[in-house]
């Protein structure tokens, strides 16, 4: 039996960004009817972001609300190491954008993902959760 691989991800969130993440986490927990780890919320947010239009992702990264959500205040969540490849793929999607001068930081991508999850419909969130469950089971 192979050991599951996980790692810790750093979120740099302001009080506003932290509140938004917790709102997303609470919503996902309600939808699943489970006590889920914080890493599951971040993973679902990134899966939703990976499926979003690159222009929407770039816009979220460049919005003033995204800048207000960032901070030097660090939070750590554990999730499958598969999340790294999803975050990298999202970064590559938006790198050539007119709205951004270069590849966004991991922190900016995570904040955009949280914003995209906050505006997603319940059905899309549950589809992303189901996909995450399948991806993590394969590892």
Segments (PLM) and residue ranges:
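Short Lys/Arg-rich basic patches
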Residues: 1-25, 29, 58-91, 107, ...
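Short, basic amphipathic alpha-helical segments that act as recognition/interaction helices
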Residues: 31-60, 101-131
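Intrinsically disordered, low-complexity, charge-dense segments enriched in Lys/Arg
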Residues: 87-94, 99, 114-115
């Amino acid at each position: 039996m192979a050991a599951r691989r996980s790692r810790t991800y750093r979120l740099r969130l302001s009080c506003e960004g932290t509140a938004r993440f917790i709102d997303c986490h609470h919503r996902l927990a309600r939808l699943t009817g489970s006590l889920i780890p914080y890493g599951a919320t971040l993973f679902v947010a990134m899966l939703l972001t990976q499926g979003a239009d690159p222009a929407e992702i770039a816009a979220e990264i460049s919005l003033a609300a995204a800048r207000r959500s960032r901070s030097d205040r660090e939070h750590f969540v554990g999730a499958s190491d598969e999340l790294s490849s999803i975050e990298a793929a999202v970064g590559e999607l938006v790198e050539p954008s007119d709205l951004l001068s270069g590849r966004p930081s991991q922190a900016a991508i995570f904040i955009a993902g949280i914003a995209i999850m906050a505006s997603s419909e319940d059905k899309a969130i549950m589809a992303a959760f189901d996909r995450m469950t399948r991806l993590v089971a394969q590892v």
